[in-house]
Regions:
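Active-site neighborhoods of divalent-metal-dependent phosphate/nucleic-acid chemistry enzymes
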Residues: 2-7, 11, 73-119
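Alpha-helix capping/helix-boundary segments
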Residues: 19-20, 46, 81, 104-105, ...
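A general structural signal for well-ordered alpha-helical segments in protein cores
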Residues: 43, 47, 60-63, 82, ...
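Short beta-strand->loop
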Residues: 78, 131-138
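Nucleotide phosphate-binding site architecture
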Residues: 20-21, 48-51, 125, 133
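Short, well-structured N-terminal submotif of metal-dependent ribonuclease cores
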Residues: 1-42, 52-65, 138
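Short loop/helix-cap segments at secondary-structure boundaries that form the rim of catalytic
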Residues: 31-35, 122-129
Length: 138
């Protein structure tokens, strides 16, 4: 069910780590998406996932520079986000394999009233009220 992402300029988007990683690795379609966004937000969890993927100190430095160049806003994990994520894990871990990181990212998106941009729609399909656009690397 993946499709190219289409959004109206001005949409509040929060990006999943997959889109950031593709842009960082030079995928033009992902980079163009970031360039066309009015603002780029990510969950603190997405930030940590991105940093964990660094292969060495030089790449860690390059990731930080990449985030700075795109003026990425990192959204903190608040008590409200924690509570909502706990409910998602409790409700969907067994039935839909809801993972901790995905629950926190979904809760961050909902709490901040932002649309989640991801290529991993199946990770989030069970989350009610989550606005999501799917992205496919071309």
């Amino acid at each position: 069910m993946n499709m190219c992402v289409v959004f109206v300029r001005g949409d509040n988007l929060i990006f999943d780590s997959d889109v950031l990683i593709w842009a960082f690795r030079g995928k033009e379609s992902a980079s163009n998406l970031l360039l066309s966004a009015e603002s780029i937000s990510i969950s603190a969890v997405t930030y940590m996932e991105f940093m964990q993927g660094a292969l060495n100190k030089m790449e860690l430095f390059q990731i930080k520079k990449f985030l700075n160049v795109f003026n990425v806003k990192i959204l903190d994990i608040t008590p409200e986000i924690t509570h909502l994520a706990m409910l998602y894990v409790e409700s969907y871990a067994l039935s839909n394999s809801m993972q901790l990181a995905d629950a926190l990212i979904a809760a961050t998106s909902i709490t901040n009233n932002e649309t989640l941009c991801t290529a991993n729609g199946k990770h989030y399909k069970c989350v009610p009220d989550l606005q999501m656009v799917l992205f496919k690397v071309e």
